[in-house]
Amino acid sequence: MLCLHNFTGVYEKQDFYKDYPHKLFDDKALCGVRGYMDDKARKYLLEEIKEKSNLSSIHLLDSGNYHHLSRVYLDLIKEPYNLVVYDNHTDMQFSAFGNILSCGSWIADAYESLDYLKKIIVIGANSKYIEACEFNKDERVIFADSINEVSLGNDLPIYISVDKDVISENEFISDWDQGIMPVSTLIKELKCLRDNFRIMGVDICGEPDNSDDINISLSDNINKELVNIFVDILY
């Protein structure tokens, strides 16, 4: 099943999900969530997920400004696991506003607060962001250009989080600065994970600006390719 969190309305301009069982959550009126997530919004989204979604689904989170919703989904995991993230950024920069959850700090928050989370693997992050990350020497955190560079035993399941800003601008334009990974490479990476690990859940964000119809169409096609990888194993 596909669960779409429609914060900006961008999914109303896309078709990739219409061939699959799906739930489209109308979150456009929700305050306190874009970029940063306050406690009220976090509580609302957690209840929405518990009532209408489940962990073992494909979760579409809208633009990268809402990537911290991944952190809310991680609250549902109740067994040891590893987190694999595809992102041009580390998302491990602590918020300038104290403990408030943000799209740039959600992985750091997960690292510090989730006992079941054993290792964090970030694929495709820009080297300048890795150098600025205070976790870049931590043995629980691995930065790499490909999952093939990572020695990760398959004894633990994984949760996968994909921000499409990891994809090259030659493919489409997201709402954040982007990496250099071709879509074809990302697909190969995700298929490798699918074929070698138990997947607990997957989320995808990185939608373009809602007024950018050309890139919304390109993103729609990419979403369909990514969803097709997991649609037979996640429900």
Which positions does each model-derived feature cover?
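Catalytic cores of soluble, metal-dependent hydrolases
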Residues: 2-61, 65-82, 105, 115, ...
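Short, conserved acidic/polar surface loops in the N-terminal third of protein domains
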Residues: 70-74, 93-99
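Long, hydrophobic, well-ordered secondary-structure blocks that form the structural core
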Residues: 83-95, 106
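Glycine- and acidic-residue-enriched helix-capping/strand-helix junction motifs
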Residues: 98-101, 181
